């Protein structure tokens, strides 16, 4: 057989055997996909398909189709078709569902997966030619490589679907950052709760099935190439040149495209220069550099003696805290509820986290960085550095695990303290550590508790659960137990510091909130993931020395506040104002400027005023 007209095919044959099938095949696929996507609701008319990446996908389909029909015989195209179509169908099907039916954002990326699907379809044909030309160890190596390739190409869509099934949203950059930052102890806790023998058995079974599927796919594709006869449309020079061209084109195109889709696109974004992850990795260097330029606005000559405490909660949702939501049926905050009308306490009922992710939220909350455009992480200083510059001794007690991101985030801030204590115990042991602290005339103490960190029941000693007053019929029993336990822990910290440490102020806020179904994530996002508690205690003598603070705090209790402004607020309270301080972001300042029109969350990408809870 001959390849082209110059070698024997008539124009009619070229038109019939190459051109028409090459055009009809991608048009048929495109029509089918448009028909399916129409039912998802996001592609209601023909104009909604006018997206550059969908156009690029169609162009790639045409190129792939023309290349395959030009080089390979009709019989071989049919013979390999059932096996060549498996991976493209899996990828195209998964992401057609994700972007067409699952209401995921960034629908412009759908075309990327159709490009990948077209190139995936071409690879078995290219691979079998290489297999046919090789023997011995080279052939065996090719088969192993194709088997491994098939396994991972089967696995990645399954991971995507599983994550969505478990959390109700796509696995995005911040989910991957959280996974990368997860400590082994957290993995063990998660597996002990979610990983029942049945679930673990199913997971192992699925992996074994995927290995088997990859093996079968590799073997079947290999069998199609066992006979060298009938693979190509001809044996002339043009066919051989065409084969080389499409092999380079399709394989090179696949390599280029795979880096733009899940999960490699997330990994590349996470590690790209200038990304939030890279900023966190450079956090320590930047803090050192920025702290060198730290200057006090007010000299600390008259700095009050005593202790200031900042308690950083975990996954606390104020909607579940009766002190903030009096209509909540469970008595989750008996101690704090008793302080609601206390003249020494101020509760903010409109507090929000800046981000539904610990890594990002605390990196902003504990530094001068904020989401209002004044400062980013690369130019920020930490609360610890501001306190030390003002002449305070700083201590940090943490019940969290040290992050595996050893050069980033809150762990680095903690280790900038004069002393840091990393405890592996229940939050109530904070008082035991406080008793061991060296004496200091002026101290800022940070306590980072586990609070309501999943898994919930693991946060509360079993012998105390019955005494916390939470009904076992409560649908959120485990979570509400952690809230009641945290209330008791804060009470004990407060009472001890007041009696033994000359307590001047205590500030409490959470890193982020929690959704009872989806926990906290960027996808899907719900506003209760950023609903957090925030309160301030000022001792009577501290109020007497600074009489404007509490009245201003009380007047701002119904003003929106986001925890990336905690730096300005606490340094204002401590009289530790620096050149990084902004009165407009200090909740205790009469110049506090954030209104409902200004308040932001989700790294500045969402407005607080759009919170559906505000419309109730």
Residue ranges of model-derived segments:
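Catalytic cores of PAPS-dependent sulfotransferases
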Residues: 136-142, 167, 183-186, 193-195, ...
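A long, amphipathic alpha-helix that forms part
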Residues: 291, 295, 432-435, 467-506, ...
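A short beta-strand-to-alpha-helix junction
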Residues: 374-379, 472-484, 522-530, 543-570, ...
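C-terminal luminal/periplasmic domains and tails of membrane-associated envelope-modifying transferases
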Residues: 389, 439-440, 495, 550-551, ...
